[in-house]
Amino acid sequence: MEIINNQNQYVPYNCLSNPENEILDIESLSSRSREQVAEISLGLTRFLLESLLPGASFGFALFDIIWGVIGPDQWNLFLAQIEQLIDQRIEAHVRNQAISRLEGLGDSYEVYIESLREWEASPNNEALQQDVRNRFSNTDNALITAIPILREQGFEIPLLSVYVQAANLHLSLLRDAVYFGQRWGLDTVTVNNHYNRLINLINTYSDHCAQWFNRGLDNFGGVSARYLDFQREVTISVLDIVALFPNYDIRTYPISTQSQLTREIYTSPVAEPGASLNANLQNILREPHLMDFLTRLVIYTGVQSGIYHWAGHEISSRTTGNLSSNIQFPLYGTAASADRAFNMNIHHSETIYRTLSAPIYSVSGGISPNRTRVVEGVRFLIARDNNLDSLPFLYRKEGTLDSFTELPPEDESTPPYIGYSHRLCHARFARSPVILEPSNFARLPVFSWTHRSASPTNEVSPSRITQIPWVKAHTLASGASVIKGPGFTGGDIMTRNNINLGDLGTLRVTVTGRLPQSYYIRLRYASVANSSGVFRHLPQPSYGISFPRTMGTDEPLTSRSFALTTLFTPITLTRAQEEFNLTIPRGVYIDRIEFVPVDATFEAGYDLERAQKAVNALFTSTNQRGLKTDITDYHIDQVSNLVECLSDEFCLDEKRELSEKVKHAKRLSDGRNLLQDRNFISINGLLDRGWRGSTDITIQGSDDVFKENYVTLPGTFDECYPTYLYQKIDESKLKAYTRYQLRGYIEDSQDLEIYLIRYNAKHEIVNVPGTGSLWPLSVENSIGPCGESNRCAPHLEWNPNLDCSCRDGEKCAHHSHHFSLDIDVGCTDLNEDLGVWVIFKIKTQDGHARIGNLEFLEEKPLVGEALARVKRAEKKWRDKRKKLEFETNIVYKEAKESVDALFVNSQYDKLKADTNIAMIHAADKRVHRIREAYLPELSVIPGVNADIFEELEGRIFTAYSLYDARNVIKNGDFNNGLLCWNVKGHVDVEEQNNHRSVLVVPEWEAEVSQEVRVCPGRGYILRVTAYKEGYGEGCVTIHEIEDNTDELKFSNCVEEEVYPSNTVTCNDYTANQEEYEGTYTSRNQGYDEAYESNSSVPANYASVYEEKAYTDGRRENSCEFNRGYRDYTPLPAGYVTKELEYFPGTAKVWIEIGETEGTFIVDSVELLLMEE
C-alpha cells in the first residue's frame, strides 16, 4: 500500500467543473500567512469584546495591537488572504495604493495618539486642546479619503479585510470626538454632527462588509471546501469585527458592554492535505437553529482496504442554559461495527477547544487503483470553565492535522486551554458518491465551531451592558423560526412565520453578582410595520413593547433596518436564574436582548440620552421647523412625559431646553390638526361646531395613560339609541385631491365603530383590550402629592406604539391602541360643503371606549392610481346624487300633497273635519319615503334632504298635536299602557304587529273606564276601532252620571248587522284602510328599497373607491329612534271602526269598555269635538 501526499495540482475554484473533485493545495494557499491574519483578527475581536471602553486607553491599545505594529508586509498578508481564497489577483496599482493608504493611516493615527496622550496629561491646556483637534481632523480626513480606495470597484471582496480595519479605526476615532469633544473645545453642534456621522458610518461600513461577504459566498455557486474556507476566514477577519461596530455608539453604550458571537463556522473537511476530496459537501451546512452545545459524540468505526476509520457518528446537544435539554440528531454516515463504538460525553463545564486529526489518503491496486480518503483517529482536547486543562478524549489515534491552524487561539500569551478562541459544537459527515465506490472511497467528518464569547449560561453582568442574542433561547415556540443572519449581527436572528401574534421562545439567564439587580431592557430588532409585542418576565409580569417600523416590506435586512426599542420601566431581577419570553407579530425580526444596569448617575444620563433621541426624532430636521408626518399627538405627549421625568439634579438645563422643543412640537401638532376642540373642552358646548355627542359621554382629565383630556363612551341598552360622538370637518379646511388621515389613541374599547364619511362610509369596528392600571401592585407612588398620576413612577408599559392603519387594499390590524383611517378628498366645493364626517359610535350593551389624542390631518396629495380612483368615486357619487334629486322631487311632491290634504289652509293651523288618525299615518309614511334625510350611519346627523324632511315632518307633528287636541280622551291609543284609565278586574295592554299597543279585555267581569271633561251642549264623535274574538259582544259606552247613555257594540260579524246611519261597518273600514294605507316603513331604509312611485330607479349611491375595499354601511338603518316617529302597521283583518254622535248635557262623561263573553281587543278610542 502506498501513501501519497500532495500529488495533485492546484485548480482555481472558478475553473472547476465538478466541485466534488476540488483539490486542497494548502501550500499554494499559504496557510501560515492566512493563519497569521486569523491570529491578528481574533486578537482584535478579543480586544473589542473585552476592552471597547470609553476613554483614551482604548485608542492607545488599538494602536499598540494593530496600527502601531502592522506594516506593509502584514497588510500584504491581509490582501493576499481573500485574494487566494477566491483566486482573484488584485491589480498591482490597487494593491500598492491600498498598502500606501494603510501606511498613511497608521502614521496619521500615531500622531493623533501622541497628541491625545499629551492632552490627557494636561486636559485644560488650550494649546494641547487645539493640537488634538487638529490631529483628529487630519486623521479623520485621511480616513475619509482612504476608505473609498479600499472599496475599489471590482475588488470589493479581496479588499474586505483591510477595509474593515480602516472602518474600525474610523469609528474609534469618531467615538473619541463624541466622548472628548467638549473637553477638546468643540461646540455641542459639532459634537452632535460627529455623533450623527458615527451612527451613519456604523451602518454604511456594516452593510458594505455584509453585502460583499454574501456576494463572495454566492460566487462559489455551492458548498465546497473553498466555500468553507472563505466562510470561516472572512467571518473571522471581517464579520466578527463588524458585529461589534454598534458598540461604538457611545451614547447607547456608555459603559463596558458584553457581546456574544453566535455564528457557526466550519473547519475544512478532515482530509489529508493536498488530496482531492471526491466527497459531496452540499449537505454540510446546518440549517439556522437555536444555539446548541455539544454534550455527546458517538463515533462508529468501519474498515476499508484494511484501514479502520471514522465511518459515522451520532450527536446529542443541549440549548443554552438548559442542562436538562437533550437534542438528538440523526445518524451521520453509517453505524459500522468494525470496532466497538467510541462514546464521548462532554460535561456542561467542559469545552472541546481543539482537535488533532489523523486523516489518511491511500492508493492500492494496480492499473485501476482504489483511492481511500478516511480518518483513522482524532484527539479531542478539553478545557474546563475554571481555566484548567482536562484529560483529552482519544478516538483510536492522535494525528497532526491541527484545528489551531485554521482556528488559532485568540491569546497566544496563555496556555491553549485558556487562550483558545472556539469551541466544537457539531460535526457533520461527507462521503463519496456511491457510484464512485470502491475505486474512490471517502468518509470525512466536518467540524463546526462557535466563538467562545457565546457562553453556555447567558450570564448577565451587574456592571456591564449585557447583550444576549435571542437564538440563545432554550426553547423555540410554535410558529417561530430561526433565520440566517444578514452578516453583521454576529449570528442568526429570529422571527415568526405566523401572521398572528405569537411567542418567540423562552430565554433563560443567569444573574451574577448580588441580588436583587435592576436593569433596563432593550431589544435590537427590525420591523416592516409599526408593530407591538409583549415582553414577559416569567412567570409574571408582562410588559407591552413597541416595534416602530424600520424598513419596507420588500426591503432586504440592512444595518439601517435594525434599531433598539426599550421598556419604559426598568425591571428587577431577584433570582439567580430568570426566564423571559417575547410575543411578536410577523414581520418583526429579533436580534438580541440587552440588559442595561441601573444606577443613579447612569440612569440620569441614560434617561437624558433617551429623551434627547426621542425629542430629536419628532422633527424632520435639526432646526425643528417641521414635524414628521408619522409622529402622533399621543407620541408627543409621551415624549413630554420622558422630558418631565428627567432629573433636575443632574440635567436641569438640558431638561428646560428639551421641554421647549416638545412644546414647540405640540404646537405644530395642534396647528396641522383640522379637528376643532381637539382637547375635549366640551361636548355640545359650541354652537354648530366642535364635538356633538350623546348625553352619556363623559370628559375625563389626564390619567396614567392620557396626558390630556379624553372621552369615555359607555354602552347602550338599545342599539336604536347608540352612544355617539361626531364632528364635521368643514369643506373650507380641505384641499382638493388630497388624502387625509384620522388617528388617535384608544386606551380600551369594545364594539367601537369608527366612521369617516364623504362620498362613502369608511367604517371599522375596533376592539382594544385594556389592562387596567399601568401601575404594578408593588408600586406605592403611582399617585402624585396632589392626586395626579405620577408618570415617572415605574409602570407596566402596555401601550405599544402600533399603527392600526387602514389604507386602500390593506387589512386593518385591530386590537391595537393606536388607530388610523384614511379618506381621500376629490374636488372641493364650498357651496356644497360636503366636508368629512368623523363619527364614533357604540350600539351594544357591552360596548365601551376610552379615546383621546384625536387628529385629522393632511397626509399627502393624490397621484397616479389613487387620484384616478377618487375621481371615479366622485363621478359615481354625483351620478347617484342626480338620481336621488330626481326621485326626491317626485316623493316630496306626493308627500306634500298628502300633508296639505290634512289641513284646511296653508297656515297649517287647523285640521279638516274628516281628517282621522289613519290619514295622518298615511301622510307620515309618505314623508318618511324621502331618502337621505339623515345619515344612515348616525341618524342625528342631517342628510342632504334634511330641510324638506323637517319641513314636512314638522307639519305632521302639528297634525298629531291638533288631532290630540280634538280627542278629549287621554291615552286613547294605549301607547302608554293603562295610564289615565281606571281598571276593574284583569285586563292587559299588549304590543302587537310591530309597535301597535292594544287593550285586551279577556273576561266579562273586567271593566276599563275614564272620566272625561267635555263642553255641555257641544257635539262630539265617539270613534272606536276594535276587534271581537269568540261569542258575545264588546261594548264601549259613553254616559253622564244618570242619563244620556249610548254605546258601540262589536261582535264577530257572523250575521249582517244593522247599524245606525252614523256608524261604520267592517266593509267600510276595510275600504278606508285601502284608501289611506295607514302603514309606512322606516324613514331611513337602505338605498336598494325603491319608491313605490318610481320603483325602477333606486337611489343607492353609497359609492366606494373599490367595491370591496370599504364597508358599505349606508344600506339600511332599521332604528327609528328620533323625531318621534313610530312605525305604525295596518290593522289585521277583523278590526272595525265604529262611530256615534254624542251631545253631553253636563261637563263630565264616562267612557266604559267591557264585554259579555270571549275576548274584546280595542285598538283606539277617540272622542272628537265637532266643528261649529
From Swiss-Prot:
Promotes colloidosmotic lysis by binding to the midgut epithelial cells of insects. SUPFAM superfamilies: delta-Endotoxin (insectocide), middle domain (SSF51096), delta-Endotoxin (insectocide), N-terminal domain (SSF56849), Galactose-binding domain-like (SSF49785). GO terms for biological process: sporulation resulting in formation of a cellular spore; symbiont-mediated killing of host cell. This is Pesticidal crystal protein Cry1Ha. Toxic segment of the protein is located in the N-terminus. Keywords: Sporulation, Toxin, Virulence. The gene is cry1Ha. Belongs to the delta endotoxin family. InterPro entries: Cry1Ac-like_dom-VII, Cry_V, Galactose-bd-like_sf, Pest_crys, Pest_crys_Cry1Aa_dom-IV, Pest_crys_dom-III, Pest_crys_dom_I, Pest_crys_N_sf. The keyword Protein transport does not apply.
